[in-house]
């Protein structure tokens, strides 16, 4: 494709961005173009395109994908096939939730909490999706063996691609199944559990922005009537798997802090229960520790 033709395409592409979203849409357009042309951020920002540009897919498909972003509200990450999260570039498909900044904060909480002597042994990522948490844990704790569980075989295929991409296949094991079901042999042996489970109440799912409501996997979003179905199950079962002084970290909806803390205390299985806030000041994470 010629640089002149790409200039014309750019003019068309920015023209279909809805006016209220123009600023964020232009940022997305730059990411979109970079993903499929290999041009540098500076070349794209200044629109100084070389005479000839190699497209990674036909121009007609490039155009169709960009139209889908605005006509169907397909998330950019699904259109380009990757999501940037923490310091990782993760493959994503509509089979997995797009990793969020809040989950980066969840890993930061883990890093700041767990002492060196517990940064080894068995760690669980329940509901791994793209594998973001499992990969983050493996990089954070080089001496640990990570067990990544998801009920979706399609999601696990994506996770395995990402795990191999970061050469962690020997330290991250994947299991298909519902929460603890595939890892029963690990009862009593686990140092810590980290999870970003579905926590949105069913009635709230229908109010989410179209990018989420219509395109991200419902399995990863819908937490049942009160949003706590999965969290309740994890809280009740985790003590059977954790070693003494084992850790449990769960990401929550901003309004669920008090309810989740009460559920954790009601199990009488944890000696320490805390609700921690995210960088926006919202209740976001449960930290619990067994005796």
From Swiss-Prot:
Coiled coil: none
Superkingdom assignment: Bacteria
Intrachain S-S bonds: none
Keyword S-adenosyl-L-methionine: yes
Residues making up the signal peptide according to the UniProt record: none
Keywords: Methyltransferase, S-adenosyl-L-methionine, Transferase
Entries under Pfam families matching the protein: MTS
InterPro entries: DNA_methylase_N6_adenine_CS, HemK-like, RF_glutamine_MTase_cyano, RF_methyltr_PrmC, SAM-dependent_MTases_sf, Small_mtfrase_dom
EC number: 2.1.1.297
Residue positions binding S-adenosyl-L-methionine: 127-131, 150, 179, 196
GO function terms (MF aspect): nucleic acid binding; protein-(glutamine-N5) methyltransferase activity; protein-glutamine N-methyltransferase activity
GO biological process, one term: methylation
Catalysed reactions listed for this entry: L-glutaminyl-[peptide chain release factor] + S-adenosyl-L-methionine = N(5)-methyl-L-glutaminyl-[peptide chain release factor] + S-adenosyl-L-homocysteine + H(+)
Entry function: Methylates the class 1 translation termination release factors RF1/PrfA and RF2/PrfB on the glutamine residue of the universally conserved GGQ motif.
Protein name stated in the entry: Release factor glutamine methyltransferase
């Amino acid at each position: 494709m010629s640089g002149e033709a790409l200039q014309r395409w750019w003019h068309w592409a920015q023209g279909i961005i809805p006016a209220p979203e123009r600023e964020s849409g232009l940022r997305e357009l730059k990411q979109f173009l970079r993903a499929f042309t290999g041009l540098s951020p500076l070349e794209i920002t200044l629109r100084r395109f070389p005479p000839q540009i190699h497209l990674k897919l036909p121009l007609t498909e490039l155009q169709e994908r960009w139209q889908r972003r605005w006509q169907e509200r397909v998330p950019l990450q699904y259109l380009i096939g990757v999501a940037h999260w923490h310091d990782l570039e993760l493959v994503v498909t509509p089979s997995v939730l797009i990793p969020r900044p809040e989950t980066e904060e969840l890993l930061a909480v883990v890093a700041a909490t767990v002492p060196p002597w517990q940064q080894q042994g068995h760690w669980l990522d329940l509901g791994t999706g793209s594998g973001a948490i499992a990969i983050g844990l493996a990089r954070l704790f080089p001496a640990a063996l990570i067990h990544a569980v998801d009920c979706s075989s399609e999601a696990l295929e994506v996770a395995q691609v990402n795990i191999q991409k970061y050469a962690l296949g020997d330290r991250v094991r994947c299991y298909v199944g519902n929460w603890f079901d595939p890892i029963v042999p690990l009862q009593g042996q686990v140092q810590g559990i980290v999870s970003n489970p579905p926590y949105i109440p069913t009635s709230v799912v229908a109010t989410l922005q179209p990018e989420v409501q219509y395109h991200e996997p419902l399995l990863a979003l819908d937490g049942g009537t009160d949003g706590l179905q999965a969290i309740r199950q994890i809280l009740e079962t985790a003590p059977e798997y954790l070693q003494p002084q084992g850790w449990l970290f769960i990401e929550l909806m901003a309004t669920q802090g008090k309810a989740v803390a009460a559920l954790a205390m009601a199990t009488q299985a944890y000696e320490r229960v805390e609700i921690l806030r995210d960088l926006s000041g919202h209740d976001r994470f449960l930290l619990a520790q067994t005796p």
